[in-house]
Amino acid sequence: MITSVHIDGFKTLSEFRLNLNPGLNILVGPNGTGKTNIISFFEFLSHLIDRDPSEATSHLGGAGAVFRRVKDSYQPKITARVTGCYPLDEGRVRFASRKAREGGEKTFALYEYAFALLFSPEFESVVFANQQFRYRHLNRFVSAQEFPERGKDWDLDVEVTLENDMNVTTKVRCLKGAFVDLFPFFHGGKSSKPTEQAEEFLKRFCTSSTAIPSLLIRFSPAMLLLSDDMVGGQTYNIIPSRVKVLEDSAKPPGIASDGSGLSSTLYALRRQSLRREDPFWGFYSSGRAALKRPSLEVLKNYFQLANKAIQDVDVANDPFSNHLRVTFKIQNGDYVADVPLSLMSDGTLKWISLLTAALTASSVFSIEEPENYLHPQMQGEFVRIMREILFSERQHACTLMTTHSETLLNHCKPSELVVVSLRDGKTVPVRCSNEADLSDEIAKSGFGLGYYYIAGALQDE
């Protein structure tokens, strides 16, 4: 999981620092403080690695929307540093220790990726001015608080710099012998050092628009888990009107960020064809992991939490239009009917989309304002289910969530809260420093965290 970000020059994020804890990280604060900008950065990072700086910038609305505005101009450079730590699948990692590969020891990968993006009006594009990627193996998970102490003695340290003549230079500062496997065309020799040979290899492929992690991911299957950690998470802001739009039967399964794709996902689950069987699919589709495949029975049990009248769900392909028709069997007392998806309530469709996304996506990175359209009772149920689904199997994972709902906050823990404010045009995130006292007070009084947040009882760090 990504454990911390340091950002300067991205929208309202200036001299911005945020440490992420495993589990839920709930962003709260008034409108306009930059909560969505925080989530947008992670989406930007995902496209930056999966594609290139110009496309990532265009995806978020162009340079004018991404680079920080200063008076009547904008800051021409974005700098960022991202740290993370994730467990390795030792069976797939050739350069893991023999003890780890035999299952006797758990291995974790610690990484730091720092970069500077420059918008050049001369070339009308966004390019990397500088990048540095550092990576090492450890025998335990390292949090953001421990990083300054543990972020030393790297196994791999690569830096790429854009010179004044617009040519790229590469420097491999460190390359442990076992990491030679990262470079498939690496040929050892006595005439030069391993670091120099690695530099020659990287020079063939590094450009001003190539992210170092993207390069390593594509040339080394052993680094695919790095892609899952930095790119794989999905961001959701479900819009019921988008869920109701008819979908073609050829559309691939998977819930999109706006909720579209529900029909195709349910159709694939009905046909038991959700998981991709090609073992090389993840390798050639950087960062896009195969979807999980729960049973429809499991999904229906979750659907009934919001609407007990739902007895069954069916998906059929209209042979004339090739549109997918989703119908829900509704039973309420003596009343029985087959209701099409387009006639279901907005709240029910949002609940169904959120739960289907959580159960099928390889990872869920952020959810914006899940309380919209949901009954107050279901808001608390949603938090409980998110913990149950997202973190039961992935202990070292985190999910961001934005909310304005006191009801939803009443089901959250003080340690999960991040209070966001705007100071001098800059987004500032803080965690409450009186977590223990607040937890004791909640236990004694019976009031929830939302009550104390509204009352202003949270102390900032």
List where the protein language model places each region:
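Conserved P-loop NTP-binding catalytic core
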Residues: 40-127
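Residue-level recognition of well-ordered beta-strand positions that form the cores
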Residues: 6, 19, 81-85, 114-118, ...
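Short glycine-/polar-rich loops that comprise or flank the Walker A/P-loop
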Residues: 76-78, 111, 231-232, 362, ...
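Switch/communication elements of ASCE P-loop NTPase nucleotide-binding domains
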Residues: 1-51, 295, 302, 309-461
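Short beta-strand micro-motifs in enzyme catalytic cores
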Residues: 78, 234, 322-326
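Electropositive, glycine-dotted interaction segments
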Residues: 99-289, 293-297
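Short acidic, glycine-rich loop/turn motifs
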Residues: 9, 82-90, 103-104, 135-137, ...
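Short, acidic Gly/Pro/Ser/Thr-rich loop/turn segments
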Residues: 87-89, 241-245, 427
